[in-house]
């Protein structure tokens, strides 16, 4: 019996209601800029699909980041470019400035705005309770914006969240795994990085949606408030689900699987065992207690849910009590009345409705 499909609780109809050229990235015609206008300065890092350099635009002396793509299918390159173009100007989304092609290797390179990033492994150890709330609220602005534009990021993790600690600015980067959401569509489960993979990916449930990003955000929140990086530390994709089950419980996992008629890989029979759901309070210790509040645990509990349809949406998350101090500070800075704890989002109006499961 096939799994029961599900549908996003919000923004489900964004792409079906837009012209085909908005989401049909395979038909997208790339407009190539002039590579001679850019000079590389130093290598910043490398990923599975690219090498990243700091550079500058010679005509303006403007600092830029240059992402040189490794040979991958043209379809994947077009998808990343189309998504970045669609999201250009969105709150806290890295800005794509230009697309150029190396004349010798024929390799495409993406030119981005420069962000003076702080290394997250050092930065996260110094963040106060308020800082964590502040930066997660900024990240939620980016997530609600991309979701409102019909796009799932599918690789939310600290490495893809650039923070300029001096300017207190945040950018969500690396849209190479991002995809357009279409209701009832099956997607590849080989996305996201292991420690941030939602249970839906680990049980091979393909009909997922934007809520995948909210699980990853929950993993980031847990690692930040408990000072445990990463929070779920699996040795492989199978062990990753075991680590989650040891915290969220195995009974709850089996309920989720039954609800969606998911067939669990037989390999889990030997390794899952039986585990009770743990209270979040058990992860508090002397070094992290200043970061853990009742509202932080309530917020975390509403993100780290097996059932993707039960997780808070980005817009709901922004309205959570956890962000009240941030919203109040925003309101004071803007000289407006305090917005009773509701996070104002710059997205399209929420199409929120009850969680839907077809045929349930």
Curated annotation (Swiss-Prot):
Where is the Protein kinase domain positioned along the sequence?
A: 38-323
Binding of ATP: at which residues?
44-52, 67
Origin species: Caenorhabditis elegans
**Could you identify this protein by its name?**
Casein kinase II subunit alpha
Localization in the cell = Cell projection, Axon; Cell projection, Cilium; Cell projection, Dendrite; Perikaryon
**What phylogenetic lineage does the species belong to?**
Eukaryota, Metazoa, Ecdysozoa, Nematoda, Chromadorea
Quickly give the catalysed reaction: L-seryl-[protein] + ATP = O-phospho-L-seryl-[protein] + ADP + H(+); L-threonyl-[protein] + ATP = O-phospho-L-threonyl-[protein] + ADP + H(+)
Gene (UniProt): kin-3
Residue spans of biased composition, Low complexity class:
338-354
A single Gene Ontology biological process assigned to it is: DNA damage response
Cite the active-site annotation: 155 (proton acceptor)
Name the job this protein performs: Casein kinases are operationally defined by their preferential utilization of acidic proteins such as caseins as substrates. The alpha chain contains the catalytic site. May participate in Wnt signaling. Modulates two aspects of male mating behavior; response to hermaphrodite contact and vulval location, acting in the same pathway as lov-1 and pkd-2.
One GO MF annotation is: ATP binding
PROSITE patterns to which the protein is assigned, alphabetical: PROTEIN_KINASE_ATP (PS00107), PROTEIN_KINASE_DOM (PS50011), PROTEIN_KINASE_ST (PS00108)
EC annotation? 2.7.11.1
